[in-house]
Amino acid sequence: YGRIKDTFTPVIIEKMKEYKIEVCGHIVCNDDMEKITKAILELKEKGAEMIVCTGGMSVDPDDKTPGAIKATGARIVSYGAPVLPGARFLLSYLEDGTPVMGLPGCVMYAKATVFDLVLPRIAAGIEVTKKDLAHMGNGGFCLGCKECHYPNCSFGKGV
């Protein structure tokens, strides 16, 4: 861990800025379930109202992030969404309602992903349900147009 330059965090910070969300902390962990669980709980303790985990969830079947999120006691809404890019998205809520999301790598490089469909609702304080995620399957395939017009396109129309 620490051998690969973190290019994910700047992308998340920019997406958060669009909704005037302040990033109150950033913790880098290796793929260790206990450390990830501890980091999530530490961010919650610092007052985080939303927690975003990034890592190898979309490419590494042994990634520890989903298990670490579950180990916090979070209620898993879904680990997977009928949306491309973003099929390996994980959504959960801590006991007090704080959303904890596990983001697949596509969020780092694709302009529009499942995170872009979910983030506005989370930012507005709306709890996203399994049914909401299922509805995202209608228009859930980003065509990757040469010139992106999201949100003025068919992507996410089921939201």
What would you call each of these model-derived segments?
Residues 1, 56-60, 105-109:
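Gly/Ser/Thr-rich loops at beta-strand to alpha-helix junctions
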Residues 28-37, 151-159:
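Short N-terminal signal/transit or membrane-insertion segments
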Residues 38-90:
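Glycine-rich phosphate-binding loop
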Residues 68, 72-159:
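Flexible glycine/proline-rich
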Residues 23-26, 52-53, 102:
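Short catalytic-loop micro-motif centered on adjacent basic/acidic residues
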Residues 19-20, 48, 96-99:
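Short acidic (Asp/Glu) and glycine-rich catalytic loops that position anionic groups and cofactors
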Residues 6-12, 41-42, 67-71, 116-120:
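Short, solvent-exposed amphipathic alpha-helical segments in soluble enzyme
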Residues 1-31, 35:
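Glycine-rich phosphate/diphosphate-binding loop of Rossmann-like nucleotide-binding domains
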